[in-house]
Amino acid sequence: MGVGIKLFQLLIRQKLTGKGLKGKQVTPQIVSYAVTKACNLRCLHCHADARDAFPNELTLREATQAIDEMAFLGTEALIFSGGEPLLRKEFVLKLADYCIDVGIIPAMLTNGVLINHKVAYELKEAGIMAVGIPIDSPEAKLHDRLRNVQEPLTKR
């Protein structure tokens, strides 16, 4: 049996037992949760074709149960993403607050279009520890073209 086959079998066996290569229990330290597939932009490069919401997005109860399981497993941080997570802002704010209660650091990845002073304050108050906003080019015109936005980046 070749080395490649043996390695593959080892990886499968470790995956099925939930242990890493050194036999230690695997913990999902950082989890990214796409709270919706819906998006307010139509980026040229989007792999998700994020236009409409998932037909069966998690309810608040289902999401908090999943967060409980993450906390039990030792997850340290949960990144809310999408689509655009701020299209479900109230949902994200409640989940962020819940994350704090169970000891998970909440963060968010957003296109930033929906953030203003009020939203930034709400995110801070809910306990969101970090917000990632991708910038696709140092040139505002190219960034806006890639993101398919009408309002220039410099005016936001």
Where are the predicted features?
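N-terminal pre-core extensions flanking Radical SAM catalytic domains
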Residues: M1-A50, D68-A71
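Radical SAM/AdoMet-radical enzyme domain recognition
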Residues: E57-F80, R88-R156
